[in-house]
UniProtKB/Swiss-Prot annotation:
Found in most tissues. Interacts with SYS1. The modification N-acetylmethionine is found at residue 1. This is ADP-ribosylation factor-related protein 1. Its main location: Golgi. It is found in: Golgi apparatus; Golgi apparatus, trans-Golgi network. It comes from Homo sapiens.
Amino acid sequence: MYTLLSGLYKYMFQKDEYCILILGLDNAGKTTFLEQSKTRFNKNYKGMSLSKITTTVGLNIGTVDVGKARLMFWDLGGQEELQSLWDKYYAECHGVIYVIDSTDEERLAESKQAFEKVVTSEALCGVPVLVLANKQDVETCLSIPDIKTAFSDCTSKIGRRDCLTQACSALTGKGVREGIEWMVKCVVRNVHRPPRQRDIT
């Protein structure tokens, strides 16, 4: 009887889990975005001081609950030598958030090259991609049209998948909630990558 009730409880209350990769060059604001996401969606999470965030070497993990979905974020280091590790996580993921530093015009071509490798990977075929033009709170930042123009060569390589380019300021939190909610809709309806299985035994 206990097993039946335990299974029913899990079925009723356990959330479907989706793994989301947060990718982009170093200093794009990936970890700040992750912290803002946790602060906005987790009521009891106080968050770390954004000024204390340093360059990620390896992996940061965070979890956010949105409705009946649980998003498990994997924030991967963006330095060139760490980008070769990104594809180790592709098979497990349900969505990609690609963060661009829209104040760093000098590295835009480098960011585009890294993005191209992501969207052309067969392991990510059909996986939704949210492109965040971060640091939009800075007056001298590139606009969304500027970034879309710079990345226009990638349009044909995105393939048949949900893809959105959105303005964001991870520092102020602007655009964070909207981006996460868009991603949730996409991963939930993507039948090609079902959520992690519930354990209802």
